[in-house]
Amino acid sequence: MFKKEIYTSRREELKRRVGNGVIVLFGNNDAPCNYPGNTYRYRQDSSFLYFFGQQREGLVGVIDVDNDEEYLFGDDIDIDDIVWFGYVPSVNELAAEVGVSHSAPMAELRDYIDRAQQSHQPIHFLPQYRSDIQIQMADIFGFHPLETKRHASVTLIKAIVAMRRVKRPEELEELREAADICYEMHVAAMRNCREGVTEHHIAGIIEGIAMSKGRGYSFQSILTMHGEIQHGIPSFKPLQAGRLMLCDAGAENKENYCSDNTRVTPVSGKFTEQQKGIYEAVKAAHDWVMAEARPGVKWLDMHLGACRILTDHLKQLNLMKGNTDDAVAAGAHAMFMPHGLGHHMGLDVHDMEGLGQEYVGFNDEIRPSTQFGLNYLRCGIPLEKGFVMTDEPGCYFIPHLIDLWKGQGLHKEYINYDEVEKYRDFGGVRLEDDLLITETGNRLVGDKMIPIEIKDVEEVTVNG
């Protein structure tokens, strides 16, 4: 937890940005796994953490902008809880730790909101991603649980996005720590990548590192020989010689700040010539982004530029043809890279995605696209100093997508389908690093680059 002055300052800024009314920020509850007493690993809501800092479940933070009052609502534990879980500070003590003057039992929250509504104060809350919180909100505010998104405050969303999108010095230190944990995870994955070891075994090793150094992984690890599956979870299948292992994994540090990196490792210890060709194509796009990303440059242009670099290299491999600009404008490259270049990162690995990507990554001028591939771009706006972005181009050979496009004759003027068939069982390559946008350019969030050059990846894989 940061010093209470940081949370106080954040709430004061939020008041100024919202202007009037009552802001209600819901913390998360425990979520049962297979029966009520066996819960999933607890994860606090990120916006609640940002403004109220407390990790305990069952809390709601309230900021009355008009009357300049702040409350923490929640229930104190009883002796039965103490027997099983030990002593937990009272809600009043938790409030004081983050500079909040008032606390009250959860049962009083509804009456508090009723009084605010009777006084015609606007009520500001965020869209919710958990059904139990949606039900809680419906009980308090009086609308159907499925209507919470429609009633969410755009004013509050935009205010929080503006604050959380630009990372402050204390946050950058936490992100650096998360990145350094991620370095250890990916090097361990490379060292353990060999024929006969299961995907699940390696995932267990790297997730153990994340748990031992922080709060665990920042998302379920993607670790698979089938890198063409964008979110392929680890299986119990043993790694096979000749294939590539794609590992997309990250960590949360003790303050819940995230990291997210992707590397690809040859199971045999050496890349084949075919694998090198695709790997270098992706790396060229990745490196171009690192060279060009700076304040004022649109992330949309970074994405399209990376796609042009990838297309040029695929033309050299005879997988694509024709004019590069025309091919990218038509979306032909999306058969190979059907996703966006990257995303914001912070307290969420896809930072603030639950608030709506139209607010986080777009504006009135730059809107989300409907074109296949480009429609998965999570950000298009100009970069600003303090943004933390992932740089993660990729190239994939997805058999079902190849068959669909080939059968439709789609983009046949740009794609050499006969040559693509030679890569049908290739899998996929994605290379991802976390970048901090600085005053004049960008730098890695962490202290050191995870091995990425082909010779370095092979060295770690073969020799440890």
Regions found by a protein language model. Give the residues of each.
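Active-site neighborhoods and metal-handling regions in enzymes and metal-associated proteins
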Residues: 1-464
